[in-house]
Amino acid sequence: MELKLLNENGQEGAVVNASDVVFGRDYNEALIHQIVVAYQANARQGNRAQKDREQVKHTTKKPWRQKGTGRARAGMSSSPLWRGGGRIFPNSPEENFSHKVNKKMHRAGLCSIFSQLAREGRLSVVEDIVLEAPKTKLLADKFKAMGLDSVLIITDTVDENLYLASRNLPHVAVVEPRYADPLSLIYFKKVLVTKAAVAQIEELLS
């Protein structure tokens, strides 16, 4: 598989030969959907809590007598049928939202994403991205010259200047290959990979 090499002006020049195992896979929509859903589910913290009928503070007195009033029978005001009553199946912080995905499936899904990005022209290779100082303006000007606005940068090692400069840009992220997740790969319009990171990605996913 040949990946396009971009220069600092965003123009395509030479090509980089990459592994077909990683960057030449067929598109597998079902598998990609599965690993994205699992990634989102595993990110959930379980920070919602509701009360069941045992936890709500209500009297246990019967609201009215069983027969003779013409109204529906009622046992206590904490009933889930009543306003202010407890929930039948309340949300709990102890809920387990995790989804398990086998390692082979996860790797195959990432390969399918990388391959589709390459086919769509959303994946490009750069020699390296170097900044003289941790200034957001320097990085913003560089991306403006390349015609980019939503970028995921995958580098072999995260340079401190690059990381600090990217933090204040709303649609830019910098990660190492081992931290590239399926959701970010799909979300960003463009994925820039340094030449050294291509080899690391092939090693991780082959």
Swiss-Prot record:
Give the organism the record lists.
Burkholderia multivorans (strain ATCC 17616 / 249)
Q: Name one Pfam family in it.
A: Ribosomal_L4
Question: One of this protein's GO BP terms?
Answer: translation
- Entry keyword rRNA-binding: yes
Annotated stretches, region: Disordered: 46-78
Family of this protein:
Belongs to the universal ribosomal protein uL4 family.
Keyword annotations for this protein, in alphabetical order, are:
Ribonucleoprotein, Ribosomal protein, RNA-binding, rRNA-binding
GO molecular function, one example?
rRNA binding
What is the recorded name of this protein? Large ribosomal subunit protein uL4
Q: Which gene encodes it?
A: rplD
Q: Assembly and partners?
A: Part of the 50S ribosomal subunit.
Keyword rRNA-binding in the entry? The reply is: yes
What task does this protein carry out? One of the primary rRNA binding proteins, this protein initially binds near the 5'-end of the 23S rRNA. It is important during the early stages of 50S assembly. It makes multiple contacts with different domains of the 23S rRNA in the assembled 50S subunit and ribosome. Forms part of the polypeptide exit tunnel.
